[in-house]
Amino acid sequence: MKIAIDAMGGDYAPREIVKGALLAAEQYRLNIILVGDEEQLRAELGRSNAGGLVNIVHAPEVIEMREHPAVAVRRKKNSSIVKATQLVRDGEASALVSAGSTGAAMAAALFGLGRIKGIDRPAIAGVLPNEKGLTVLLDAGANVDCKPYHLLQFGVMGYLYAKKIFGITCPRVGLLSNGEEETKGNEVTLAAYHLLQKAGINFVGNIEGRDLFNGNVDVAVCDGFVGNVVLKAGEGLAGALFKIMKEEISKSWLAKIGTVMAEPALKGFKSRLDYAEYGGAPLLGVNGISIICHGSSTAKAVKNAIRVARESVENRLLEDIRSSIESIEVKGAGGNLVQEID
């Protein structure tokens, strides 16, 4: 399996991207294609023993965070994210991973790979830790404004993602709202509620913010505006908890002694809240596997994002989404949504 990596995208590119790619190549025995400035990439590879698992595709241009995504993707045909996407489109790579501009990664995927038939809006599937495991959250930032049938499509794709990648037999799908009652929500969520009821997935109804973290659902559906706010708030809360904990521990020598005793548990706690453990989030709904990473991804996060890409390919996630969406014709509010999803 070959995975294309946008080696120039991210706050710590190309060094951390290359390090993460090498870790993944060695651990998962994958063929990695690093896409970016060849001179810089060879310099980074010179610091390690890359072996025969890594190749370079030269891409002299980089799309910066401040650039307009769609305009930049059209103008910079030789940028690392565009070149990496083309490798997937042309069948030279099975998936791509990028820690660069989320907007550029989305635009490159839409222009280069296209949408799956029946999907109007691709969605980013983020992951949040909960008391019992994790919650898939989508959309996590791709679509600020959504129609009811967009949320329906997100629910179907999230259901399949949780089932295929996380091994959940019958994922519970909830619609994020301001109350559990069927009558709660705005015009969009009220309409989406009834569409999701008929979609042939395990829809459990409306959920509230606390349900994202108590393990009552496996998939939470919302628009990209709400999803991105939730995701960033979760990251901020996790960081604040660690800082508060450190401050409290530093106030007492007894607490410091207790910390030594509790070190294994604290490490486990930190690991569960660390976004790097989950790697990247797939852009579901495009005709290819595209994994989007946090802009500040370290080598560990990049390695785990590549793992997500590998698992998505091995579990035939794209094929399952395509066949399921087409079979139930999730094309709009008036679609036929009575067929069960296997």
Swiss-Prot record:
The answer to whether the entry has keyword Lipoprotein is no
Quote the InterPro entries the UniProt record gives: FA_synthesis, Phospholipid_synth_PlsX-like
Source taxon at top rank: Bacteria
List the GO terms this entry assigns under cellular component, sorted alphabetically.
cytoplasm
Q: Which reaction does it catalyse?
A: a fatty acyl-[ACP] + phosphate = an acyl phosphate + holo-[ACP]
Q: Where in the cell is it found?
A: Cytoplasm
| Entry's Gene Ontology molecular function annotations | phosphate:acyl-[acyl carrier protein] acyltransferase activity
Q: How does it assemble?
A: Homodimer. Probably interacts with PlsY.
User: What is this protein's name?
Assistant: Phosphate acyltransferase
Q: What species was this sequence derived from?
A: Pelotomaculum thermopropionicum (strain DSM 13744 / JCM 10971 / SI)
Which gene is transcribed and translated to give this protein?
A: plsX
